[in-house]
């Protein structure tokens, strides 16, 4: 079980303690850390919707440190990022791999960044299925559709031609923060807070 630091604040009504993530949520900062899976996606989506209801005109900051994970869970987060009114600024701290990189690139144009030593990795979706031959064929067709959708969205967000994305995601493709910026997955590399 991970330990979560507590923050104590003085208010006019006395002391109030928050876990660090709840305190940062008050500042419109959401952390996406670890594997992208359904429970995490539901929490991220709920936080995005909550912050939109609090102030639909103020940017939301999504900090990403993730090795990737479930495509469907990631798409729930991505679709919500695109759906809500506030811009979602994305920042890679540590790593944004696979679905993490997809979400990083899906931030608002001009508002996607990484810290200088962050790593970004894009690749094609992974899948495995066992069963009857006809069911395996159905799942193979579905993963190819998902691959095409992910590649189209990456092409849109990066400005790269679809054919280049298809080539570059055929195998694991690791990039430094600077390389990810040159590729179009992010807009800037942040060295120091201004």
UniProtKB/Swiss-Prot annotation:
Instruction: Report the top EC class in one word.
Output: hydrolase
Q: Which GO terms describe its biological process?
A: protein quality control for misfolded or incompletely synthesized proteins
Q: A Pfam family for this UniProt protein?
A: CLP_protease
- Protein's UniProt keywords contain Oxidoreductase: no
Catalytic machinery residues:
98, 123
Per its UniProt record, what Gene3D superfamilies does this chain match?
2-enoyl-CoA Hydratase, Chain A, domain 1
Q: Name one GO molecular function term.
A: ATPase binding
Where is this protein found? Cytoplasm
Keyword Protease included in the entry's annotation: yes
Gene Ontology terms: cellular component: cytoplasm; endopeptidase Clp complex
Q: Which reaction does it catalyse?
A: Hydrolysis of proteins to small peptides in the presence of ATP and magnesium. alpha-casein is the usual test substrate. In the absence of ATP, only oligopeptides shorter than five residues are hydrolyzed (such as succinyl-Leu-Tyr-|-NHMec, and Leu-Tyr-Leu-|-Tyr-Trp, in which cleavage of the -Tyr-|-Leu- and -Tyr-|-Trp bonds also occurs)
Enumerate the SUPFAM superfamilies for this protein: ClpP/crotonase (SSF52096)
Q: Which UniProt keywords apply?
A: Cytoplasm, Hydrolase, Protease, Serine protease
Q: What is its EC number?
A: 3.4.21.92
Q: Which HAMAP family match?
A: ClpP
Self-association and partners? Fourteen ClpP subunits assemble into 2 heptameric rings which stack back to back to give a disk-like structure with a central cavity, resembling the structure of eukaryotic proteasomes.
Protein task: Cleaves peptides in various proteins in a process that requires ATP hydrolysis. Has a chymotrypsin-like activity. Plays a major role in the degradation of misfolded proteins.
Q: Which PANTHER family match?
A: ATP-DEPENDENT CLP PROTEASE PROTEOLYTIC SUBUNIT
Give the family this protein belongs to, as stated in its UniProt record: Belongs to the peptidase S14 family.
Q: What is this protein called?
A: ATP-dependent Clp protease proteolytic subunit
